[in-house]
Amino acid sequence: MTDGLRRIAMVSMHTSPADLPGRGDAGGMNVSILALASALAARGVEVDLLTRADREPVDRELAEGVSLRTLAAGPPTPIPKGRLVDVADEFGEAVATLVGRRAPRYDLLHAHYWLSGLATLPVAIELGLPFVQSFHTLAAMKNRALGEGDTPEPEGRLRGEGFLVTQADAIVAGSSAEVTTLIDDLRASPDRLWVIPPGVDTELFSPRRARNDTAVREHLGLELDRPLLVMAGRIQPLKDQELAVRILAQVHASRGWAPLLVIAGEASDDSYRDRLERIATDLGVESDVRFVGALDRETLADLFAVAELTLMTSHSETFGLVALESAASGTPVIGFRGTGLVDSISDGESGVLVATRDAFDWAAVVVSLLGDAPRLARLGASARGYAEGFTWATAAASLLAVYENLVRS
C-alpha cells in the first residue's frame, strides 16, 4: 500500500468500464479505465469504478482490488448520452452518498469524460477531496473534424469542459494532440496538466495468436485464403468506415481483386451502416466487406493477429488505443496523420501515417504493403517492438505519482 493513498474512485458516469468495447458508447476509454484500475490495484491501491445503473444496480468485483459500483440516477434504463446531463446532479448526489459525507471512504476522485466531471466535481469540493479529470475526447477536437452526417458537440459540453479545466486539481491527458487542444482552446494551465499515454496488454495482443489463423477465420466466417484489412470500433461517421470501403474499392480497381475488409463493432446508428452497405454495393465490393459485430477481447486479439493491416480512418482520435493493440499483435496500422494517432502510430515503425483523406492515397499504401511481403513482415515485427514500450504498469505508476502528489498537498 502506498503512503497516504488507500482507496480511490474512478467515475465513468455514461458507460461502464466493464462494457464491451465497440458496442454502445464503449470504446478505448472503457479499456483504459479497467486496465489502469487493475494496474493500480497491483500496486496496493483499492479502486472502485462508479457508473450509472442503466438496469437494476448490481455491484461486483471485476478483479482483485477493483470493484464496480452502479449508482441509481434517473430511470434504470439506457439513456442517450446527449441527455445524460439531465441526471448529472442526481448521479453526483448518489456519488456523495456512497463516498460518505462524514468520513469519506476515498482519498481521491478521478472523473473520466466531461459528464463524470460535471457530476463529481461538486462532491470533491464539498468533501475536500482531490479531484482529477480525464476527458478522453474533447468537444473542440471533435467539432474541428466532423465527418459527413456527424452532429456537432453542443455548446453546453464546450462550456462544461472549459469550466472543468479551471477547477480540476490535475488534468490527465493521453496524447500531445489532446494537450494542444487543452492549452490552446480551453486555456488549461500547463502546471496542472499531466500527459500519461495508455498502455497495451502485450500478453493478450500478441503475434503468437496468428497460429490460430484457420480457426479464427472459420469462427468469424472469413475466407481462408484472402488478406484481411481490419477496422475495429463503433460504426459511426466519426470513425469514417466509409473511407475504408472506398479504399477497398480503390485497391480493387488497381489490382483487379480486393482483400477482405473486416469491420468489427456495432453501429451507433443503423442508417450509417445501411449507407456503408449501399456504398459498397455501388462500388462493386459488397462481397468483400464483412461486418462481424462487437468482439470480445480474446476474439479481437485473434483477429488483429491474423490480419495483414489495420485501418484507422477516423476524422478525430485523441490517442487511438486500437493502434497499439494492432501493433502489439504484429499487424501494422495505416492511420490519418491529422489526429492523435501521431502518438500511437510511429510512422515507418508501427505503421504508416497518411496525410490526406483521399482513398487513392490510402489504397496506394495498402497495395504497396500487400505487394511486398518482406517489408510487411519487417513492419509487423517493428510494430510489436514499438507497442512493447507502452505498458499499463508504466501508465499506472505515472498516474499514481499524480495522485500521491495531490494527496500529500
Predicted regions and their residues:
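N-terminal subdomain of nucleotide-sugar transferases
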Residues: 1-66, 70
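Carbohydrate-associated surface elements
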Residues: 177, 199
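Glycosyltransferase donor-sugar binding loop
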Residues: 260-278
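Nucleotide-activated donor-binding/catalytic signature segment of Leloir-type glycosyltransferases, i.e.
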Residues: 273-295
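Aromatic "clamp/platform" in nucleotide-sugar-dependent glycosyltransferases that forms part
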Residues: 315
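Short hydrophobic beta-strand element within catalytic cores of glycosyltransferases
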Residues: 332-335
